[in-house]
A protein has these predicted regions:
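Catalytic phosphate/metal-binding cores of nucleic-acid and nucleotide-processing enzymes, i.e., regions
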Residues: 1-105
Length: 105
């Protein structure tokens, strides 16, 4: 599965806009074909990605966009720190299961 993320610091892509923008095949294909930032903004609006005021998405993360291939069946989430997005896989995370009153040590 292809996912668009922006690794550069400053502004994320889907984490600063509509989360569905990370997975939209139309946006991914356009990016892979070399679309410009302005044309991507127009495409996002055509696809219905506008904020609550009807404004187009913020394109600050566009310059650092990349396509990441996620293996089929993988549990993942898009994380963001200071605008830099990254993929976190379930098995790479520290998850705890609540059982009983106290966690067994």
């Amino acid at each position: 599965m292809k996912v668009l993320i922006s690794r550069g610091y400053g502004a994320g892509w889907s984490t600063w806009n509509d989360p569905r923008m990370a997975f939209d095949e139309r946006l991914i294909r356009a990016f892979e074909c070399g679309i410009t930032s302005e044309d991507m903004k127009e495409l996002c609006v055509e696809c219905g990605y506008v904020d609550i005021h009807g404004e187009p998405p913020y394109m600050g993360g566009f310059k650092q966009l990349e396509v990441v291939d996620i293996p089929s069946g993988e549990l993942f989430q898009i994380m963001e720190y200071d605008g830099s997005e990254y993929i976190e896989y379930f098995e790479d995370s520290d998850w705890y299961l609540a059982e009983g009153e106290y966690y067994p040590v």
